């Protein structure tokens, strides 16, 4: 599995994101650059200029028309993907750490930082998916996180809930329409921040990554923990693969703790776990520094990782990845194949 190395950033990556079709990959970093790449060959399509601070987060709407980014310059910006044109800027009192479009693209949530006397908030903006439409200045909803600030957040299926991960290791479920807090459950170790939250394809469950060295698979409906994936290093990111029942975790010793660590000791690897059986399957090495963000291609053919070293690596899975099965899975597949043949012959 030879990686394609994308060198378009001068500083650490903060987030990478595939569009819904899986043909474009967007990357943002602390160097104030947004890059977009063709996912199949790593060719750079272009960059989006305008932010005046480190860019923490990126998301793309379901139709691949509009791009949203959140930055340390205290703004959320909307861009036209095709031309790179800046469509709208919303200003906030503090940095924006996470943005995410709802399933239909009609709403955008933003997570703002707790700083300088301002409490952390989750804001919701109404979005028109027409590049020529006038976007509203008003926030449709603001949720104030009074206990522990939200570090990540996202929309569940049908925009029914807003799910947020917090600095104290808890996960909250808010009503997607009025912002009421429905649940707040301690999921990870106390005061070990949740660093990432990524959705399954149908948004009925999600995966978290945390500094407590674990990743958890959780239902959106009632925040029940389905699976736990233990690692031996603090985790920065986790994602769920399509086609195969795997999850990919990324992390490593924190950048500020790294002195003269070898890449092996620093544990700068992408880890593959079986989604159902919770056991580690393998690791992919390559980054020289912690993995800050991982993303799985929605078509299930590849995955990408972004590191503290400023590189994005796209890995296209080879045949062995798709053929790999546990014995129990293989037996089940053989049974299904036999049943199909019997029904055909009958």
Curated annotation (Swiss-Prot):
<comment type="subunit">
    <text>Component of the eukaryotic translation initiation factor 3 (eIF-3) complex.</text>
</comment>
<comment type="similarity">
    <text>Belongs to the eIF-3 subunit I family.</text>
</comment>
<keyword id="KW-0648">Protein biosynthesis</keyword>
<keyword id="KW-0677">Repeat</keyword>
<keyword id="KW-0963">Cytoplasm</keyword>
<feature type="repeat" description="WD 5">
    <location>
        <begin position="286"/>
        <end position="325"/>
    </location>
</feature>
<dbReference type="GO" id="GO:0071540">
    <property type="term" value="C:eukaryotic translation initiation factor 3 complex, eIF3e"/>
</dbReference>
<feature type="repeat" description="WD 4">
    <location>
        <begin position="189"/>
        <end position="228"/>
    </location>
</feature>
<dbReference type="InterPro" id="IPR015943">
    <property type="entry name" value="WD40/YVTN_repeat-like_dom_sf"/>
</dbReference>
<feature type="repeat" description="WD 3">
    <location>
        <begin position="145"/>
        <end position="184"/>
    </location>
</feature>
<dbReference type="GO" id="GO:0001732">
    <property type="term" value="P:formation of cytoplasmic translation initiation complex"/>
</dbReference>
<dbReference type="InterPro" id="IPR036322">
    <property type="entry name" value="WD40_repeat_dom_sf"/>
</dbReference>
<dbReference type="InterPro" id="IPR001680">
    <property type="entry name" value="WD40_rpt"/>
</dbReference>
<feature type="repeat" description="WD 1">
    <location>
        <begin position="8"/>
        <end position="49"/>
    </location>
</feature>
<dbReference type="InterPro" id="IPR019775">
    <property type="entry name" value="WD40_repeat_CS"/>
</dbReference>
<dbReference type="GO" id="GO:0034399">
    <property type="term" value="C:nuclear periphery"/>
</dbReference>
<dbReference type="GO" id="GO:0002183">
    <property type="term" value="P:cytoplasmic translational initiation"/>
</dbReference>
<dbReference type="GO" id="GO:0016282">
    <property type="term" value="C:eukaryotic 43S preinitiation complex"/>
</dbReference>
<comment type="function">
    <text>Component of the eukaryotic translation initiation factor 3 (eIF-3) complex, which is involved in protein synthesis of a specialized repertoire of mRNAs and, together with other initiation factors, stimulates binding of mRNA and methionyl-tRNAi to the 40S ribosome. The eIF-3 complex specifically targets and initiates translation of a subset of mRNAs involved in cell proliferation.</text>
</comment>
<dbReference type="InterPro" id="IPR027525">
    <property type="entry name" value="eIF3i"/>
</dbReference>
<protein>
    <recommendedName>
        <fullName>Eukaryotic translation initiation factor 3 subunit I</fullName>
    </recommendedName>
</protein>
<keyword id="KW-0853">WD repeat</keyword>
<keyword id="KW-0396">Initiation factor</keyword>
<dbReference type="GO" id="GO:0003743">
    <property type="term" value="F:translation initiation factor activity"/>
</dbReference>
<dbReference type="GO" id="GO:0033290">
    <property type="term" value="C:eukaryotic 48S preinitiation complex"/>
</dbReference>
<dbReference type="GO" id="GO:0003723">
    <property type="term" value="F:RNA binding"/>
</dbReference>
<dbReference type="GO" id="GO:0071541">
    <property type="term" value="C:eukaryotic translation initiation factor 3 complex, eIF3m"/>
</dbReference>
<dbReference type="Pfam" id="PF24805">
    <property type="entry name" value="EIF3I"/>
</dbReference>
<feature type="repeat" description="WD 2">
    <location>
        <begin position="50"/>
        <end position="91"/>
    </location>
</feature>
């Amino acid at each position: 599995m030879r990686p394609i190395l994308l060198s378009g950033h001068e500083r650490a990556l903060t987030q990478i994101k595939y569009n819904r079709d899986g043909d474009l990959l967007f990357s943002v970093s602390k160097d104030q650059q947004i890059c977009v790449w063709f996912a199949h060959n790593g060719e750079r399509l272009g960059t989006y200029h305008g932010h005046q601070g480190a860019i923490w987060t990126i998301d793309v709407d379901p139709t691949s028309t509009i791009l949203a980014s959140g930055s340390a310059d205290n703004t959320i910006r909307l861009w036209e993907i095709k031309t790179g044109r800046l469509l709208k800027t919303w200003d906030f009192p503090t940095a924006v750490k996470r943005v995410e479009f709802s399933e239909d693209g009609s709403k955008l949530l933003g997570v703002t930082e707790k700083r300088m006397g301002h409490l952390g908030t989750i804001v919701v903006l109404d979005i028109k998916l027409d590049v020529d439409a006038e976007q509203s200045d008003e926030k449709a909803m603001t949720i104030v996180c009074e206990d522990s600030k939200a570090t990540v957040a996202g929309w569940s299926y049908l925009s029914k809930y807003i799910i947020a991960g917090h600095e104290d290791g808890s996960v909250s479920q808010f009503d997607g329409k009025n912002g009421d807090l429905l649940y707040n459950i301690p999921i990870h170790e106390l005061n070990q921040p949740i660093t990432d939250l990524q959705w399954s394809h149908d948004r009925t469950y999600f995966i978290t990554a945390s500094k407590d060295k674990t990743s958890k698979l959780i239902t959106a409906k009632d925040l029940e923990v389905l699976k736990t994936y233990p690692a031996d290093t603090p985790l920065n990111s986790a994602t769920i693969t399509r086609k195969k029942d795997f999850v990919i975790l990324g992390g490593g010793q924190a950048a500020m703790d790294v002195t003269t660590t070898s890449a092996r000791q620093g544990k700068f690897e992408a880890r593959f776990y079986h989604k159902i059986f919770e056991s580690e399957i393998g690791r992919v090495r390559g980054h020289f520094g912690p993995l800050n963000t991982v993303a799985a291609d929605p078509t299930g053919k590849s995955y990408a990782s972004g590191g503290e070293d400023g590189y994005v690596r796209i890995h296209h899975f080879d045949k062995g990845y798709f053929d790999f099965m546990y014995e129990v899975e293989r037996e089940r597949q053989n049974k299904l194949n036999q049943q199909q043949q019997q029904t055909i012959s009958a």
